[in-house]
Amino acid sequence: MTNPIHIVGGGLAGSEAAWQIAQGGRRAVLHEMRPRRGTEAHQGEGLAELVCSNSFRSDDANGNAVGLLHQEMRSLNSLIMRAADANQVPAGGALAVDREGFSQAVTAALEEHPNVTILREEVAGLPPETWGSTILATGPLTSPALAEAVGALTGRDALAFFDAIAPIVHRDSIDMGKAWFQSRYDKAGPGGTGADYLNCPMDREQYEAFVAALIAGEKTTFKEWEATTPYFDGCLPIEVMAERGPETLRHGPMKPVGLTNPHNPTVKAYAIVQLRQDNALGTLFNMVGFQTKLRHAEQVRIFRTIPGLENAEFARLGGLHRNTYLDSPRLLDATLRLRARPQLRFAGQITGCEGYVESAAVGLMAGRYALAEAEGTTLAPLPPTTALGALIGHITGGHLEASEDAGANAPRSFQPMNVNFGLFPPLERMPRNETGKRLRGPEKAALKKRALTDRAREDLAAWIGGEDLPHAAE
């Protein structure tokens, strides 16, 4: 009997890796410590539990890098994308999911797969060498014992930062005499209608008082080691954004553009708080961009000053959780193996990707790399022109820059990253209009994104088919 491939961690990356291995005909053993041992952020014991937002972000495969990543993962039989599509809830142009239904779908698919064994146990340190090929997908909440073991093996400390969790509100406690349903610019998306967000308007006086309250509100106190731990810019607590300047929020999560208040259509709101459906029943809505480290009592007091939320009942209040990630360009090779111990691969947020979809995507590739290795074959390198290739390239070497002082392979500061078009190689030729004239402004940006996504689809199809890739060397 062939040796199984072990996966440690049953989050999005680990679940996707196990699925890819099992679908490839190899046995996968998935180790998940919950419910035997919980974490600071998880609520239940299901696999692929979403601990922060319920949004997979934009599903636009022509104009958005994460939407392109969705499409690429679907083309590679992603379990995470299959479960997301089956459990989508309205969210404008985004793909958002019923978090419980999503986790249940992933859990059921893996529990029922004949090639998957799920062991509910903690792997406290490094896996034994007798396991052979192993994928560590322990996520941002990697246990201290395992984090210390990895640090001891690599000789480098893992880096850490915080993610903050947004509150969830009961729909029936929102005052619809002040709030209204509308997606920004009335944009419909997967499962959406163009009226998928609840909007709560503020005038200037209300907004300024709200910002002042956020800044003055009592915050969660840090342990000594946490005091110097930075935040990831893509998930800043709302009060930290407020501290960056009085206009920051109304140009960020509270921007009022593309929305019209039907209760007072002639008056433009100064700022708008949006809430997004959080479950299939539509009974729960999360506050978009309102991740916070305010104390719970302060959250209730301050958030009830938002028009429409004066009597809000909270199903969950916001909080903080620690996120640990590797200095991956130094520590991992091109197939996500640990250079110091090639039996071990890493996947998910611990590698320095950021976001649900990105974590699952890295898990997908880690699973395929491990499967190919177990079968005695080698996967052709992913085209860097694809979303998958750009993301893996960023993690395993895209952040390297030559330096006379530090050597040719010295990485500059490595930070967690969402997939974005800045990670893609530039186009050989910029888009032009029908007359051949070079474009400028929004039209140029839209056509450039379409050209990048068209190129990615062409190159991924060639990679899947084993064809020569004309753009891979750009």
From Swiss-Prot:
Keywords per UniProt: Cytoplasm, FAD, Flavoprotein, Methyltransferase, NAD, NADP, Transferase, tRNA processing
Enzyme Commission numbers on file: 2.1.1.74
Annotated Gene3D superfamilies: FAD/NAD(P)-binding domain
Known cofactor(s): FAD
Biased composition, class Basic and acidic residues, residue ranges: 429-451
UniProt-annotated stretches for the region Disordered: 425-451
TM region(s), chain numbering: none
Gene Ontology MF, one: flavin adenine dinucleotide binding
Enzyme superclass (EC): transferase
PANTHER family the UniProt entry points to: GLUCOSE INHIBITED DIVISION PROTEIN A, METHYLENETETRAHYDROFOLATE--TRNA-(URACIL-5-)-METHYLTRANSFERASE TRMFO
Name used for this protein in its record: Methylenetetrahydrofolate--tRNA-(uracil-5-)-methyltransferase TrmFO
Species per Swiss-Prot/TrEMBL record: Methylorubrum populi (strain ATCC BAA-705 / NCIMB 13946 / BJ001) (Methylobacterium populi)
Gene: trmFO
